[in-house]
Amino acid sequence: MEDFVRQCFNPMIVELAEKAMKEYGEDPKIETNKLAAICTHLEVCFMYSDFHFINEQGESIIVELGDPNALLKHRFEIIEGRDRTMAWTVVNSICNTTGAEKPKFLPDLYDYKENRFIEIGVTRREVHIYYLEKANKIKSEKTHIHIFSFTGEEMATKADYTLDEESRARIKTRLFTIRQEMASRGLWDSFVSPREAKRQLKKNLKSQEQCASSPTKVSRRTSPALRILEPMWMDSNRTATLRASFLKCPKK
């Protein structure tokens, strides 16, 4: 699974996912299914915000790469992928600026057009079940919930899907591609089944124990991709270039 993740996702996404796991004391080299799930969720959050801007009239518009209107305001503020301290700083800033109610849990995005926080979900199960779990956890009507599945289904608060159909179709197509690529490598069953995932986790732990006594050279260098992209990622005036730079799974 780890090889698949590194082949299928942009290096920046993988590094952000690894940082998030380590922040919670989890090992991305062992819990590879969780790493894949976090990478998928991150990419969906980025794709959700791709190309969406707000013009001077306050209208939501879609601007493709290469368009001269690069100074337009991004419609969505991405919160997911930041470390917790920075994420809460962004949330507090948004609340102070817009008057939005501060959420109890960190959301994934903020929609400047609809003036609401958004919680994005990507599930391997039934969308309505995952939606109810999210709603029960958040317990706030102020946070909008939007759930996607790997089968092309989706569910959103009050059936308000926020994005246009084409933008949502891009996300669904990407999720379906990830599923197909996992299946072709024999990874999908363990990604979906808790029992199979537990078996794979034990296998990973055993493999790591065997390698523990072997001398390992650890690189301390920051990857070129992250070194270039991270300043843009942290910049509130980031362009759509970062948002659209994600790699597709290579053909076998």
UniProtKB/Swiss-Prot annotation:
Biological process according to GO: viral RNA genome replication; viral translational frameshifting
Ranges of Polar residues composition bias in the record: 207-217
Region (Disordered) residue spans: 203-222
Site (Important for efficient shutoff activity): 202-203, 206
Pfam families: Flu_PA (PF00603)
Active site: 80, 108
Annotated site residue numbers, Important for efficient shutoff activity and nuclear localization: 195, 198-199
Any one GO molecular function term: RNA binding
Coiled coil: none
Entry keyword annotation includes Thylakoid: no
UniProt keyword terms in alphabetical order: Decay of host mRNAs by virus, Eukaryotic host gene expression shutoff by virus, Host cytoplasm, Host gene expression shutoff by virus, Host mRNA suppression by virus, Host nucleus, Host-virus interaction
Cellular compartments annotated: Host cytoplasm; Host nucleus
Protein role: Plays a major role in the shutoff of the host protein expression by cleaving mRNAs probably via an endonuclease activity. This host shutoff allows the virus to escape from the host antiviral response. Hijacks host RNA splicing machinery to selectively target host RNAs containing introns for destruction. This may explain the preferential degradation of RNAs that have undergone co- or post-transcriptional processing.
Family affiliation: Belongs to the influenza viruses PA-X family.
Note on domains (UniProt): The probable endonuclease active site in the N-terminus and the basic amino acid cluster in the C-terminus are important for the shutoff activity. The C-terminus acts as a nuclear localization signal. The C-terminus is recruited to host protein complexes involved in nuclear Pol II RNA processing.
Protein name: Protein PA-X
Gene for this chain: PA
